[in-house]
Swiss-Prot record:
The gene is queF. Gene3D superfamilies: 3.30.1130.10. Keywords: Cytoplasm, NADP, Oxidoreductase, Queuosine biosynthesis. One of its GO terms (cellular component) is cytoplasm. Its EC number is 1.7.1.13. SUPFAM superfamilies: Tetrahydrobiopterin biosynthesis enzymes-like. Coiled coil: none annotated. This is NADPH-dependent 7-cyano-7-deazaguanine reductase. It catalyses: 7-aminomethyl-7-carbaguanine + 2 NADP(+) = 7-cyano-7-deazaguanine + 2 NADPH + 3 H(+).
């Protein structure tokens, strides 16, 4: 990361509550939400922030949602939050947790009001429409948890690894044309600001020249000591595969383990992709 970007994200760290001891609000406070611009990191990996040549969304699941009903009785629920990958900003995850915590002692007459409030606040924060669904626990009791992504698991490959900083040179192809669905549970990187580990699974769906599986796995493992936010890591994987492998079509889907009750799940694709049916919950989530 160049010095200009380091300065930008250091300013973000200083202005946000990442890595700092935070006070918790007793009542609803939308001012806790903190946006982070997408553009600087996209410029670093040569993704035009204004381009429509890639598509996708960011999906967040929040497992610790609670507020008070009109009689003061607590309500608990789960929330699913999603927004388009072309929003000007992402939401800083700690600020989202603190925002949701501010709802805990706040009174709302019904679920619909909670949904409308959250959607309005998050949309204002990132400068783009945010879809919010809030589900009482009784509605999600039968939710399926999947052991893994569909596809060929790369993690069974017996390879030697010694590079733990991002190395796209591992990526290569043969002349054979294929359509493949691949995945790995070995994705690990670190938060750009706090250096805390981020654990995830990644699925790669592509059509084109066959990508060398061993090299792809080494490439994914090379993120192990890399510092970047979840969304930025998935976009970097997408951009590197497009650059080094030049597939006809590509989708990269990351599903990360939760922190502070939240998990983040970005997808980037060369084709328009609908959110419906994509929010599958993996075993580590």
């Amino acid at each position: 990361m160049n010095k200009e970007l380091e300065s930008i994200y250091q300013n973000i760290a200083n202005q946000s509550e990442l890595g700092q001891t935070a006070n918790y609000d007793s009542y609803y406070n939308p001012k806790r939400l903190y946006p982070i611009p997408r553009a600087p990191k996209r410029q670093e990996i040569n993704l035009d922030p204004n381009s429509t040549t890639f598509y996708g969304f960011d999906c967040w699941n929040h497992y610790e949602v609670s507020w008070l009903n009109s009689k003061g009785k607590p309500v608990v629920a789960m929330a699913v939050i999603s927004y388009d990958c072309h929003s000007p900003c992402i939401i800083e995850s700690k600020s989202l947790k603190l925002y949701f915590n501010s709802l805990n002692n706040s009174t709302f007459p019904d679920v619909e009001t909670v949904v409308q409030t959250i959607s309005k606040d998050l949309s204002h924060c990132i400068g783009s429409e945010v879809a919010v669904n809030v589900y009482p626990l009784s509605e999600i009791a039968s939710q399926t948890i999947y052991a893994a992504f569909d596809g060929i698991c790369l993690d069974k490959l017996d390879i030697e690894c010694s590079v733990y900083h991002v190395m796209p040179d591992f990526l290569s192809t043969s002349s054979k044309l294929v359509e493949e669905v691949l995945y790995s549970d070995l994705l690990k990187s670190n938060c750009l600001v706090t250096n805390q580990p981020d654990w995830g699974s990644v699925q790669i769906i592509y059509k084109g020249k066959k990508i060398n599986h061993e090299g792809l796995l080494k490439y994914l493992i090379s993120f192990r000591n890399h510092n970047e936010f979840h969304e930025q890591c998935i976009e970097r994987i997408f951009a590197d595969i497009m650059r080094f492998c030049q597939p006809e079509s590509l989708a990269v889907y990351g599903r990360y383990t939760r922190r502070g009750g939240l998990d983040i799940n970005p997808i980037r694709s060369t084709e328009p992709c609908a959110f419906d049916g994509q929010n599958i919950r993996l075993i580590r989530q």
